């Protein structure tokens, strides 16, 4: 039959016939369409299987038995002794591993990747802070100290190994508000090219029992994975105040969180690529356990700027602004005795507003003096209010 068909084609087939060419093109088009429909059908079959398949149960490996079975703690409740699927390498299983179990046979069919808490992950600063040492005025001594303690061990650990000393694990920055403690930490992170993990200590104080300690533990696990890294804990007095026996559940939870923090600090080797910086305005209320050798070894005071420091801070901020060129930095520094770096920044910002109100596109000396007087009046009013409330 096939020979007869081939013979018929040989006699009657004419490839130059336009009708034949049209039919060939049509057949080719239909063949391609059929292939695409088959692919779509296979895709829909796969999706249907996924929709109908029962979900897996998440579990944590507790122990591996000699006979190859595994003890797991199921997310649904009880501890189970389960088998391991043949396509799973049992060497990959270890206590603490996350695995997936089938619902019916409770067999381990997949090893899950380590899970990162989204709340903890949000502490990591993805983009490096755009703050450099040149942006900080009046703190040259503090900059040199923090570079020796944080930056040098991260960049040149071999120096410490060769001499045979251990660099400090952590640095505690203390001083009045607005003196540049956070700026120092950001500048170190920028200059050392380390992952910067910033957290306010009050975020460790959680509502539920054990939650704060868990977050502390996971923050330091994140720091180890992202090493070299710097963990910056701002306002550490929120959880690091001296422990007192008040008996309230909230106080006990804060104490548990503090003990977890101390345990994590003690767990680091000095030359690990993880450094800790903490900042506080209240050194006097911190628990002595935080300040003992081996934890926050180096205490760096960040005081209010002196005369030369205030001049330098004014130069840093005013060089970014448009001025008339007749700025007397010595006069500005003498008028702002007792001002912090943050207050000097407020003076420059207020001077800019005064210039805008007066219809100018630049700042002059008069604007700055007016701004200083305004900030002083505001500070005096706040002090008088505090004094009045104290004796009411």
Swiss-Prot record:
Keyword ATP-binding among UniProt keywords: yes
PANTHER family according to UniProt: 26S PROTEASOME REGULATORY SUBUNIT (PTHR23073)
InterPro entries named in the record: 26S_Proteasome_ATPase (IPR050221), AAA+_ATPase (IPR003593), AAA_lid_3 (IPR041569), ATPase_AAA_core (IPR003959), ATPase_AAA_CS (IPR003960), NA-bd_OB-fold (IPR012340), Nucleotidase_PAN (IPR023501), P-loop_NTPase (IPR027417)
Organism annotation: Sulfurisphaera tokodaii (strain DSM 16993 / JCM 10545 / NBRC 100140 / 7) (Sulfolobus tokodaii)
GO cellular component, as recorded: cytoplasm; proteasome-activating nucleotidase complex
Entry's free-text remark on domains: Consists of three main regions, an N-terminal coiled-coil domain that may assist in substrate recognition, an interdomain involved in PAN hexamerization, and a C-terminal ATPase domain of the AAA type.
GO terms for biological process, alphabetical: proteasomal protein catabolic process; protein unfolding
Keywords of this entry: ATP-binding, Chaperone, Coiled coil, Cytoplasm, Nucleotide-binding, Proteasome
Region listing for Docks into pockets in the proteasome alpha-ring to cause gate opening, in residue ranges: 390-392
Source organism, top-level taxon: Archaea
The keyword Nucleotide-binding is assigned to this record: yes
HAMAP family: PAN (MF_00553)
Main location: cytoplasm
PROSITE patterns per UniProt: AAA
Residues the record lists as binding ATP: 178-183, 317
One Pfam family of this chain: AAA_lid_3
Stated family: Belongs to the AAA ATPase family.
Function text: ATPase which is responsible for recognizing, binding, unfolding and translocation of substrate proteins into the archaeal 20S proteasome core particle. Is essential for opening the gate of the 20S proteasome via an interaction with its C-terminus, thereby allowing substrate entry and access to the site of proteolysis. Thus, the C-termini of the proteasomal ATPase function like a 'key in a lock' to induce gate opening and therefore regulate proteolysis.
Coiled coil residues, start to end: 19-53
GO molecular function: ATP binding; ATP hydrolysis activity
Subcellular locations according to the entry: Cytoplasm
Family annotation (SUPFAM superfamilies): P-loop containing nucleoside triphosphate hydrolases (SSF52540)
Stated name of the protein: Proteasome-activating nucleotidase
Subunit field text: Homohexamer. The hexameric complex has a two-ring architecture resembling a top hat that caps the 20S proteasome core at one or both ends. Upon ATP-binding, the C-terminus of PAN interacts with the alpha-rings of the proteasome core by binding to the intersubunit pockets.
């Amino acid at each position: 039959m096939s020979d007869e068909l081939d013979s018929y084609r040989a006699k009657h087939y004419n490839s130059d016939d336009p009708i034949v060419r049209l039919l060939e093109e049509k057949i080719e088009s239909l063949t391609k369409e059929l292939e695409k429909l088959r692919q779509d059908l296979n895709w829909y079959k796969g999706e249907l299987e996924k929709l109908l398949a029962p979900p897996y149960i998440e579990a944590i490996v507790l122990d591996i038995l000699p006979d190859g079975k595994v003890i797991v703690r199921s997310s649904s409740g009880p501890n189970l002794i389960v088998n391991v699927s043949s396509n799973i390498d049992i060497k990959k299983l270890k206590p603490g591993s996350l695995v997936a179990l089938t619902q019916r046979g409770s067999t381990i069919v997949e090893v899950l990747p380590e899970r990162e808490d989204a709340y903890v992950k949000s502490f990591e600063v993805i983009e490096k802070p755009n703050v450099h040492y040149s942006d900080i005025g009046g703190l040259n001594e503090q900059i040199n100290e923090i570079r020796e303690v944080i930056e040098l061990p991260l960049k040149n650990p071999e120096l410490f190994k060769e001499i045979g000393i251990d660099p400090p694990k952590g640095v505690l920055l203390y001083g009045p508000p607005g003196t540049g403690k956070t700026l120092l930490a950001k500048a170190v992170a920028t200059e050392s090219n380390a992952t910067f993990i910033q957290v306010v200590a009050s975020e460790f104080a959680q509502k539920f029992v054990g939650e704060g300690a868990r977050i502390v533990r996971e923050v330091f696990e994140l720091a180890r994975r992202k090493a070299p890294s710097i963990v910056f804990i701002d306002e550490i007095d929120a959880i690091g105040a001296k422990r007192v026996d008040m008996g309230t559940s909230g106080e006990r939870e804060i104490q548990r969180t503090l003990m977890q923090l101390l345990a994590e600090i003690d767990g680091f080797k000095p030359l690990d690529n993880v450094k800790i910086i903490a900042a506080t305005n209240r050194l006097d209320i911190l628990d002595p356990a935080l300040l003992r050798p081996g934890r926050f070894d180096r205490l760096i005071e960040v005081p209010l700027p002196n005369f030369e420091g205030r001049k330098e801070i004014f130069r840093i901020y005013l060089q970014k602004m448009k001025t008339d060129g007749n700025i007397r930095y010595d006069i500005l520094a003498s008028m702002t005795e007792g001002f912090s770096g943050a207050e000097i920044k407020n003076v420059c910002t207020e001077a800019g507003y005064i210039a805008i109100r007066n219809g100018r596109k630049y700042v002059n000396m008069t604007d700055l003096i007016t701004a200083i007087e305004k900030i002083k009046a505001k500070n005096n009013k706040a002090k008088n209010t505090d004094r009045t409330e104290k004796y009411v």
